[in-house]
Amino acid sequence: MDLTPYRFLMTDLARASGEFIRPFFGRAGLVVDIKADATPVTQADRGAEELMRGLIAKKFPGHGILGEEFGGERTDAEFVWVLDPIDGTKSFITGVPLWGTLIALLHRGQPVLGCIHQPVLGQMMLGDGVTCTLNGRAVRCRSTTSVENATLLTSDPFNPSKYQNGAAFNALRQRAKLVRTWGDCYGYLLVAGGWADVMLDPIMNPWDIAALVPIIRGAGGVITDWRGGSAFPAESTVACSTPELHAAVIAALAP
């Protein structure tokens, strides 16, 4: 299957949404609403998703769309775009530049293309499950095989205790060489780019995960849920740089 036309649209979506969102970042008085799930949302989130939806509908009107802010349409289509206009809205509204835009393309329910776009940092990562590039340059995961030599990342250090086995996570964290909360999509970019080794999120939505799967796999890494099961659909994510490290992490997280 030739993904070239979809890859072109994906990069166009990333650039267009980034240009829309950037002026809102760091703006004084930015209005923040709280959604029913207690997560924040802004005009930038909503406007960027509307923009991307419009571009997709114009280019591929038969494709489906699933977005964080406006839900799904034609989600049973052969091709479905999955959109998270601002992954890391809490970072966005507090002036932390590690937020990004996640864009994925599903083919018959599985992610085949993914993009992480960091507009403030000027980084665009694209993966197709076989290859992965950062600003057009091929990247690969590191070769770390043990937890003791690993840099471990997570978005919120308190979430494992809320949603998974907190004691197991804390024990794993104590074993790691370095632990940081460079989280949300930026953490997965660091794993795929070869700067970190493990990225964990104990609670995820489809728009959080879909783009990450072809990116991590394209960079040579392994991505599953917290029990080593299917990466998508899933409600949690473990991404590791090598199969050996992934096996060790999954074993450590076991209840």
Where do the protein language model's features map onto the residues?
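An extended, acidic
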Residues: R140-P255
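DPxDG-like acidic metal-binding loop motif
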Residues: T75-V130, A150
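Short strand-turn-strand beta-turns centered on an Asx-Gly dipeptide
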Residues: R108, N135-A138
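Generic detector of well-ordered alpha-helical packing
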Residues: R46, E69, P85-G88, P119, ...
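Residue-level signal for inorganic ion chemistry
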Residues: I21, D45, I56, T89, ...
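A short, compositionally biased
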Residues: R27-A28, W99, L126-T131, R217, ...
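N-terminal subdomain of lithium-sensitive/metallo-dependent phosphomonoesterases centered on the IMPase/IPPase/PAP
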Residues: M1-I86, V222, S230, E244-A251, ...
